[in-house]
């Protein structure tokens, strides 16, 4: 009889020998309900029902006993059910520790969790934790597993809640971080003795080592056999080990003072984020600091879902830096790469040249070439990298070679076109190569006197199966060819049928290639008949067409074309098109076949030719200059869809260049496919070396059926090698590399996929990584070991030896020459100084002039000053002020030559009449403009106040030998005039815009990556997406121009001595050409003028035009003007009305929210304090956390904190430091390098206060005082108009500086406008950029309205195209202010209005071209009162 479940339980208790330990009730009432057995997993699960909870001690004894009894048979678990759960809450507290042990938490965290307070309420268990972070972590990490553990023990629990005690949060935060991340001490005790010994020895070694950690090792060593690929991590796991290379690392300090590190690694199967908190009393931070991008690490930890980034991450317990075996070039004799593409190959190459050069050097290659597509923009960086790594750099380019004009007529015949007989024919073939493919259909029609008089149509049997591609293209099937005659029979019959007629074909070179090859194989020799190519003929006589395919031409000529790509139909269509073309030629005066090429040739013939790739290698310095000329001509003169190099251009500048055959797109490779060997060898003689590239790179040609198979490809290689051997030309193996390693190829795929029109999208991209010598030898093993070594190693090294050392970048500055520049600058400086200070110059003036002139003239900089002076003078003469930028205002010579308005001398008075002066040299006055008003004691005239106290050293350095960088702010509307004036000064061929290179930005790359993954149906975690984004970032995307930079070439050199030239973004309609090199590359070699466009001078000019006030006469210390920087009272409004505590809305430099807050904090009242504000706002770590705190705590006031870089030198010299040391300190601090021990000691010796030293140590970047002073001077002048001439100011502001308008709000009353502004403030964080720009305009409008002025609606009768105009106390906005209305339409409205009034909305749409949407907006604005939808017809109009 079967045992009951109670009996089973008793048997079990006896078997595991605990019967005597159990309570009698439990022993008698307990039930063993079932046992779940898994033989596969060797697990037994006992299901036991008890009448009550076992005492915790008994429970542990039971579990231990049952595990021991069956340990050799299975892994045992128990699942209890308790029928009477009385006192469940008490038992839960006792069982808590055991249940925690069943979770996946680390032992250390388990220990901490066991100390938490437990509260049981019904079926809910509450665990009291210290803070929100702890609560979130425990809830996520163990909630489910903890509930399961309690239920397995018999507890009836629905959920567990982790609750925080708010009072404990702050004090326990640091403890929490440790709990989550620290190593488990208990686990360490259970480790093997050997491991303990290793750790002890390592600890001892670290204790004895006082130097910084140079290799990361945290936690336990990780067993390599546990490593798994990152791509296999797809869900949360307790313990995982991985290896990867770091591609991003971020170390963040927490409020507790500890740090968290976030590392992104990849093993190139996938990527993962690793995280870890530093442990207390450990040197983890130093270990993390030893890590950097590019290092390999082995890491171990828990995989969990990060709720913030919503992705899997590893919370590390262990990490160690490892040495990963890198790719080696093990060949004894290394090769040289002659074909390589960098990130400058537009949207095609991946790494920068520096990465290639470093890798080549690491492999021991003696040299390396760079051959980007159509450009040489990598040359400067290539030179620097080669010098750094000690490797020979070979400079080159892969260009597009075209014949100067593809002929229309071949083998000219003396035949009158109207009398000739033509055979218009077409062939269908098994492929594109007449050498390796066969004709399957030959069709022709015979034409005479404009009519088709005969037809010829034959199939031929190729004796091979047609590919699916050919069947789909031609609609010819194998069945149609089975019984077809041999091609020999077809061609023999065809030749006889043709007679002496002129051949006509569309793309005749293709069709005639097959005919001539067939004739020659039959022993006929090539055809002697004349030929006309209708494709080239159309390109010449139909230049207005963008396409010239047969389909397109058939439509244009009205010819029916059915079943395109069947020979007979194509032939008939071509015949009818050609008949019409003959008439066109007659109208152009072309009457004879032998006149076609002569009379129809044109200068744009290069556009018609099909480009072939060609490699150009620089052999010497002359070759470099010639290459620069070729590149320039291809980009400027011969650009058509892509830069083109006419063969005649290459021939003209071939000296110093080695010409190679390039890739499968090269002329020679094409010839092997299309011509017999004698023709191939003839073409080969044009080149200096023949390239053959790895078969792997040509696999796509086989896939696309352009090459039949690998055997055919090998035959092509043999023919290329034979051509080289026959012509005595070296054959070299080149890699055509587009990236460094195989795993980088994905980035190129992504970039190519982002270009829908790129032909490379048609096929699978081959592996184009940078190959080692061994890899290249292996690629060409089919040639035999000796021949492979010859082309891979021997020939590449010999070719490299023929190339001289070439330097692409000059090593010194070449400035223009201007006769008498030294004398003119000296005379001009002294003349203006005497005009201002009198004939008897003060000694301080003489000393400063002489000091500066000695440096300026002695170092050859006078010409730079003179150029700047003439540019500024021209602008001033034309009525536009010029603002200076940068440190030029530090130069008193620049002031005296009127380059800048900033006077850098110490603050001083000057009498305009008797020239008496008084200088303040003790630092007591920050700016001369802040001196109190004073009259001359001699003559009683009001004294002029000047001087900003700026040392000259901040401009040209302490020795005065730094090349001056004079940046000038011209009016934006005058800037083109200033640019063009440089052509007057130097000549059109001596000035160019400074070129820039636009690369793929991170945000753009992210779009490319996401698009590619979506298209491919691939899901990747965020870390892998980040890696792919980094791979695509930095690749050249376009070119551009510096907004104001003009490069000046000296008259004794030409531009090609420095750089090629081009149009920005290849825009052939651009008014200026730019440098081909990024201007930074040649910054130290040629003079760069920064002629920038700025709104301030434009606004000043408009204010001057409106008011008639000369801006130079505006007082800089006007009290009401100064007041607006701390209160809006002088504007006649309150803070509440304009919602701002200052009156600086719209004042340059002081109108942004950030600077307005600075003004509220500091309440400046003087010009020097405004200069301080400008310096503080532009610096990095100068205000926030630095000067701001010093002012708030009362340690300093605004005038004494460090604001501009020059303040440091001036302050320290006044404190007693030597000028040279003061200068060194200033330079160190402004560059964010802090202070050396020597500097600190010197400053303390001169009693510089500690707060000053601390402030210096925090600064990362500082603004020049001269720049700040120039900005503030403009700002104060504009503010003057705002205070004293409001409508002039508002009209100018809205016209010049504003761009986004909400006119519907702007025409409302002041209360409505204020409410709108207030509402937008409340939603500020949710506003987009455009809305924020609108808000800026509405802030100004609100202020204007509360000052008693208002905005009218747009007026069809009065509004201008672009300018706000004043009418009474109102402004009338221009048409351009209407959202969505462009410049051209704005002008068109005004022009149409001048022709007469608009009669209706329909009339407005018709005359001005306004869209319905714009008309509706104007209607809503109230700008179209009484204007009907349509004009009413009057009797007088009839």
Swiss-Prot record:
UniProt enzyme class: transferase
Location, primary (coarse class): cytoplasm
GO (cellular component) term, any one: cytoplasm
E.C. code: 2.7.7.7
Catalyses which reaction(s): DNA(n) + a 2'-deoxyribonucleoside 5'-triphosphate = DNA(n+1) + diphosphate
Subcellular localization(s) per the UniProt record: Cytoplasm
Any GO BP annotation: DNA-templated DNA replication
One GO MF term attached to the UniProt entry: DNA binding
UniProt keyword list: Cytoplasm, DNA replication, DNA-directed DNA polymerase, Exonuclease, Hydrolase, Nuclease, Nucleotidyltransferase, Transferase
Pfam families: DNA_pol3_a_NI, DNA_pol3_a_NII, DNA_pol3_alpha, DNA_pol3_finger, HHH_6, PHP, RNase_T
Residue ranges annotated for the Exonuclease domain, each copy included: 422-578
Keyword Ribonucleoprotein (UniProt): no
SMART domains, alphabetized: EXOIII, POLIIIAc
Function summary: Required for replicative DNA synthesis. This DNA polymerase also exhibits 3' to 5' exonuclease activity.
NCBIfam families xrefs: dnaq, polC_Gram_pos, PRK00448.1
Family, per entry: Belongs to the DNA polymerase type-C family. PolC subfamily.
Protein name (record): DNA polymerase III PolC-type
Species whose genome carries this gene: Staphylococcus aureus (strain bovine RF122 / ET3-1)
Gene it is expressed from: polC
């Amino acid at each position: 009889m079967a045992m009951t479940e109670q009996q089973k339980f008793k048997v079990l208790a006896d078997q595991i020998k605990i019967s005597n330990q159990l309570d009698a009730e439990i022993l008698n009432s307990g039930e063993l309900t079932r046992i779940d057995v898994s033989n596969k997993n060797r697990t037994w699960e006992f299901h036991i029902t008890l009448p009550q909870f076992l005492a915790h001690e008994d429970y542990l004894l039971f579990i231990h006993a049952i595990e021991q009894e069956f340990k050799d048979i299975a892994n045992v678990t128990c699942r209890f059910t308790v029928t009477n759960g009385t006192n469940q809450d008490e038992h839960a507290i006792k069982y808590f520790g055991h249940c925690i042990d069943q979770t996946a938490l680390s032992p250390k965290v388990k220990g901490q969790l066991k100390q938490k307070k437990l509260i049981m309420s019904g079926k809910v268990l509450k665990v009291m934790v210290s803070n929100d972070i702890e609560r979130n972590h425990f809830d996520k990490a163990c909630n489910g597993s903890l509930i399961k553990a309690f239920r397995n023990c018999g507890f009836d629990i629905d959920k567990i809640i982790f609750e925080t005690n708010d009072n404990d949060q702050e004090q326990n935060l640091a403890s929490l971080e440790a709990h989550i991340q620290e190593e488990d001490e208990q686990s360490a005790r259970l480790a093997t003795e050997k491991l303990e010994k290793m750790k002890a020895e390592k600890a001892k070694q670290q204790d004895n080592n006082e130097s910084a950690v140079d290799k990361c090792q945290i936690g336990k060593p990780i067993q390599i056999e546990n490593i798994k690929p990152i791509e296999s991590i797809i869900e949360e796991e307790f313990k995982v080990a991985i290896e990867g290379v770091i591609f991003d690392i971020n170390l963040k300090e927490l409020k507790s003072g500890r740090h968290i590190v976030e590392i992104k690694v990849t093993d190139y199967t996938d990527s993962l984020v690793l995280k870890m908190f530093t442990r207390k009393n450990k040197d983890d931070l130093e270990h993390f600091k030893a890590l950097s991008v590019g290092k390999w690490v082995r890491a171990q930890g828990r995989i969990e879902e990060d709720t913030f980034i919503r992705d899997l991450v590893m919370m590390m317990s262990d990490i160690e830096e490892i040495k990963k075996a890198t790719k080696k070039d093990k060949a004894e004799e290394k090769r040289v790469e002659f074909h390589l593409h960098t990130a400058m190959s537009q949207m095609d190459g991946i790494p920068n040249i520096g990465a290639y050069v470093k890798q080549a050097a690491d492999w021991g290659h003696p040299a390396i070439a760079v051959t980007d597509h159509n450009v040489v923009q990598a040359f400067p960086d290539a030179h620097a990298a080669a010098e750094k790594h000690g490797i020979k750099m070979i400079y080159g380019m892969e260009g597009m070679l075209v014949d100067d004009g593809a002929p229309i007529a071949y083998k000219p015949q003396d035949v009158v076109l109207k009398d000739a007989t033509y055979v218009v024919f077409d062939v269908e073939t098994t492929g594109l190569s007449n050498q390796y493919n066969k004709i399957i259909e030959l069709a022709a029609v015979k034409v005479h006197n404009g009519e088709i008089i005969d037809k010829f149509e034959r199939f031929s049997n190729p004796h091979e199966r047609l590919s699916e591609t050919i069947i789909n293209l031609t609609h010819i099937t194998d069945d149609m060819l089975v019984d077809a005659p041999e091609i020999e029979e077809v061609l023999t019959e065809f030749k006889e049928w043709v007679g002496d007629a002129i051949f006509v074909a569309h793309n005749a070179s293709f069709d005639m290639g097959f005919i001539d090859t067939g004739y020659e194989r039959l022993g006929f020799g090539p055809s002697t008949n004349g030929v006309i190519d209708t494709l080239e003929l159309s390109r010449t006589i139909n230049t207005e067409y963008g396409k010239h395919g047969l389909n397109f031409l058939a439509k244009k000529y009205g010819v029916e074309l059915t079943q395109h790509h069947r020979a007979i139909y194509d032939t008939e269509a071509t015949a009818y098109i050609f008949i019409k073309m003959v008439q066109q030629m007659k109208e152009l005066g072309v009457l004879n076949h032998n006149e076609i090429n002569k009379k129809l040739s044109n200068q744009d013939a290069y556009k018609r030719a099909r480009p072939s790739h060609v490699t150009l290698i620089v052999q010497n310095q002359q070759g470099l200059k010639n290459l620069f000329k070729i590149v320039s001509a291809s980009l400027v003169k011969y650009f058509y869809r892509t830069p083109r190099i006419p063969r005649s251009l290459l021939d003209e500048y071939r000296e110093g260049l080695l010409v190679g055959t390039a890739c499968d797109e090269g002329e020679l490779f094409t010839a092997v496919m299309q011509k017999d060997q004698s023709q191939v060898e003839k073409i080969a003689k044009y080149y200096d070396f023949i390239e053959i590239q790895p078969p792997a790179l040509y696999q796509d040609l086989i896939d696309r059926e352009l090459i039949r198979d690998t055997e055919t490809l090998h035959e092509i290689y043999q023919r290329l090698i034979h051509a080289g051997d026959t012509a005595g030309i070296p054959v070299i193996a080149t890699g055509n590399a587009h990236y460094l390693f195989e795993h980088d190829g994905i980035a190129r795929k992504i970039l190519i996929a982002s270009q829908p029109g790129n032909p490379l999208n048609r096929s699978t991209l081959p592996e184009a990584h940078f190959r080692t010598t061994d890899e290249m030898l292996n690629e060409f093993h089919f040639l035999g070991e000796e021949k492979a070594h010859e082309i891979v190693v021997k020939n590449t090294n010999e070719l490299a030896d023929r190339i001289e050392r070439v330097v692409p970048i000059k090593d010194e500055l070449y400035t223009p020459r201007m006769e008498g520049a030294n004398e003119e600058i000296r005379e001009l400086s002294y003349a203006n100084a005497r005009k201002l200070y009198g004939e008897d110059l003060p000694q301080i003036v003489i000393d400063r002039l002489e000091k500066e002139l000695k440096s300026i003239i002695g170092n050859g900089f006078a010409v730079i000053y003179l150029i700047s002076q003439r540019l500024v003078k021209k602008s001033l003469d034309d009525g536009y002020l010029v603002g200076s930028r940068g440190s030029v205002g530090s130069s008193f010579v620049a002031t005296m030559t009127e380059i800048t308005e900033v006077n850098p001398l110490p603050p001083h008075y000057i009498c305009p009449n008797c020239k008496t002066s008084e200088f303040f040299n003790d630092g007591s006055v920050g700016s001369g403009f802040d001196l109190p008003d004073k009259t001359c004691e001699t003559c009683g005239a009001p004294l002029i106040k000047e001087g900003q106290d700026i040392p000259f050293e901040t401009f040209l350095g302490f020795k005065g030998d730094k090349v001056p960088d004079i940046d000038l702010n011209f009016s934006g509307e005058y800037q083109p005039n200033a640019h063009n004036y440089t052509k007057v000064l130097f000549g059109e061929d001596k000035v160019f815009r400074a070129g820039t290179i636009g690369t793929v930005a991170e945000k753009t790359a992210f779009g490319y990556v996401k698009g590619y993954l979506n298209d491919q149906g691939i899901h990747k975690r965020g870390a892998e997406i980040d890696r792919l984004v980094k791979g695509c970032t930095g690749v050249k995307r376009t070119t551009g121009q510096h907004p104001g930079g003009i490069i000046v070439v000296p008259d004794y050199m030409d531009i090609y001595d420095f750089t090629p030239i081009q149009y920005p973004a290849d825009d052939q309609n651009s008014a200026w050409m730019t440098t081909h090199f990024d201007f930074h590359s040649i910054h130290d070699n040629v003079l760069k003028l920064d002629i920038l466009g700025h709104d301030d001078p434009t606004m000043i000019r408009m204010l001057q035009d409106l008011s008639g006030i000369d801006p130079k006469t505006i007082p800089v210390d006007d009290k009401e003007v100064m007041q607006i920087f701390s209160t809006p009272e002088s504007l006649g409004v309150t803070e509440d009305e304009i919602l701002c505590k200052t009156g600086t809305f719209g004042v340059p430099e002081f109108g942004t929210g950030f600077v307005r807050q600075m003004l509220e904090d500091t309440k400046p009242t003087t010009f020097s304090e405004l200069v301080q504000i400008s310096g503080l706002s532009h610096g990095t770590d100068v205000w926030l956390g630095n000067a701001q705190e010093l002012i708030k705590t009362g340690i300093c006031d605004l005038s004494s904190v460090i604001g501009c870089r020059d303040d440091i030198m001036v302050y320290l010299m006044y404190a007693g430091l030597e000028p040279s040391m003061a200068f060194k300190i200033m330079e160190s601090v402004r560059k964010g390098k802090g202070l050396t021990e020597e500097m600190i000691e010197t400053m303390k010796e001169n009693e510089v206060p500690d707060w000053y030293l601390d402030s210096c140590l925090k600064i990362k970047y500082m603004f020049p005082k001269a720049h700040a002073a120039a900005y503030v001077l403009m700002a104060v002048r504009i503010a003057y108009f705002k205070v004293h001439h409001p409508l002039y100011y508002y009209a100018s502001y809205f016209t010049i500086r504003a761009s986004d308008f909400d006119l519907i709000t702007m025409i409302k009353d002041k209360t409505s406008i204020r409410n709108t502004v207030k509402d937008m403030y409340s939603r500020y964080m949710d506003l987009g950029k455009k809305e924020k720009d609108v808000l800026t305009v509405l802030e100004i409008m609100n202020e204007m309205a509360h000052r008693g002025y208002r905005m009218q609606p747009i007026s069809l009768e009065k509004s201008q195209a672009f300018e706000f105009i004043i009418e009474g106390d109102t402004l009338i906005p221009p048409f351009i202010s209407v959202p969505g209305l462009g410049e051209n339409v704005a002008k068109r409205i005004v022009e149409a209005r001048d022709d007469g009034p608009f009669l209706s909305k329909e009339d407005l749409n018709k005359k001005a071209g306004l869209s319905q949407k714009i008309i509706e907006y104007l209607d809503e604005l109230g700008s179209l009162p009484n204007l009907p939808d349509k004009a009413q017809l009057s009797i007088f109009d009839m």
